[in-house]
Regions:
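Non-catalytic accessory segments flanking P-loop/AAA+ NTPase cores
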Residues: 1-438
Length: 438
């Protein structure tokens, strides 16, 4: 997709913020351009990381997430404030790269599973049919074998059509490997895997009695393991994470040290920034799937920078984010457009939810404008949380309908401006109340 097409796609989900959309679209297109070059030149070209500056709820995370989802890219969102300097108790910054690799491997595995779904289903059907019709003894006659094949084919069709779903069978189920901690150091991960192997040697499978319907679900793990090539999935997952991965680091401002308040800052904040440097610049990180170079991962950092400034980050880290975009706060018109012009808007979501209760919900244009106006006022009078304020205001307006569904079933309800004002009157007028409820 061209940068214009990417921005057009993002426009259907995010209102405004054109500068941020352009920066992300160009960064994404540059990856495609890089892949068209010779290998030697490719190695010299690294992504230009982006720093987004803007208050909460203006679309920073959504831009990156929508972009990654649209292109099928490995993507993780992390909070910088959750990490600690090496030597302190907590997660080290390398764990974000391990999270990315895990997300990438899962993405590739899902793609392979979808492509091999027919084979997986065949494996499951075959296993269940064999349990329902045990194989003939080795010395059976040709006539018996032919008769068995006909019966087997008929039974297989019954399993496929679900005609025998309620029959009880005893099957051998492969035990799932225990879930380990991917954020341990590489040496400890190897020790952990060795322990799991020893624990699994004694009993690879367990016998369980269940219905055919339940067996179809229970055999899914075994069928997937049997059909899919785990090694190729691992290699492809590593490659994609390395070449196409996107790491979104939120709350980067929380690890910046303000000059005004440096005496009271957490001493580990600068340590986290210094630990981030080699990851963002390019280094090799060990994961349980293998080593990954971080040179070509696109890092997008974001923060509100209310207390600190981007210049409060250590100079070396500032240099690793050469592209800076400032996202504007959302005004009343922007909030109105979010409610009316975005795909899967909040209003549409509530309409679909209440349709399941046989309630038809409509919003007048005046009501939508009133929702936008009151949400904007609440943002100005208390903390500005951007579009997230709409969730709270709409929830308050629809609270009575959502709770008393039995009274409204089979009816068509139009929400007008007066209903919106009545529902939010006390909260909007009382600043202290709005601060805690809105």
């Amino acid at each position: 997709m061209t940068p214009k097409e990417i921005v057009a796609y993002l426009d259907s989900y995010i209102i405004g913020q054109n500068e941020a959309k352009k920066a992300v679209a160009i960064a994404l297109r540059n990856r495609y351009r890089r892949m068209q070059l010779d290998k030697e030149v490719q190695e010299e070209i690294t992504p230009k990381n982006i720093l987004m500056i803007g208050s909460t709820g203006v679309g920073k995370t959504e831009i990156a997430r929508r972009m990654a989802k649209m292109m099928g890219l490995p993507f993780v969102k992390v909070e910088a404030s959750k990490y600690t300097e090496v030597g302190f108790v907590g997660r080290d910054v390398e764990s974000m790269v391990r999270d990315l690799v895990l997300a990438s491997v899962n993405l590739v595995e899902n793609e392979h599973r979808q492509k091999a779904q027919a084979q997986i289903n065949d494996y499951i059907i075959e296993k269940i049919t064999q349990k329902l019709l045990p194989p003939l003894p080795s010395g059976a006659s040709e006539a018996k074998k032919n008769e068995y094949e006909i019966s087997f084919a008929k039974m297989k069709q019954k399993v496929i059509k679900g005609e025998v779903d309620d029959l009880m069978i005893e099957i051998d189920i492969s035990k799932k490997a225990p879930m380990g901690d991917d954020n341990l150091p590489p040496d400890m991960i190897k020790v952990q895997e060795s322990i799991f192997k020893v624990l699994n040697v004694t009993q690879d499978k367990i016998k369980k009695e269940m219905s055919v319907r339940e067996a179809k679900e229970a055999l899914m793990y075994e069928a997937t393991e049997s059909v899919l090539d785990a090694e190729s999935i691992r290699a492809e997952g590593l490659r994609r994470a390395e070449q196409n991965g996107v790491i979104f680091i939120d709350e980067i401002d929380k690890v910046a040290i303000s000059n005004k308040d440096s005496s009271r800052q957490d001493p580990s904040k600068e340590g986290v920034q210094r630990d981030l440097l080699p990851i963002v610049e390019g280094s090799v990180v060990n994961t349980k799937y293998g080593q990954i170079k971080t040179d070509y991962i696109l890092f997008i950092a974001a923060g509100a920078f209310h207390v600190s400034k981007p210049s409060d980050l250590i100079p070396e880290l500032q240099g690793r984010f050469p592209l800076r975009v400032e996202l504007s706060t959302l005004d009343e018109e922007s909030l109105y457009q979010i409610l009316t012009q975005t795909k899967s808007s909040l209003l549409r979501q509530y309409q679909l939810l209440l349709e399941t209760e046989n309630i038809r919900l409509e919003f007048s244009d005046e009501a939508i404008r009133e929702l936008a106006r009151l949400s904007h006022n609440a943002n100005q009078r208390t903390e500005d949380i951007g579009a997230r304020r709409l969730h709270t205001t709409i929830e308050h307006v629809l609270e009575d309908i959502s709770f008393n569904v039995d009274e409204y079933q089979g009816k068509e309800i139009e929400v007008n401006a007066e209903m919106v004002r009545e529902a939010l009157a006390d909260l909007v007028e009382n600043v202290d109340l709005a601060r805690y409820i809105l």
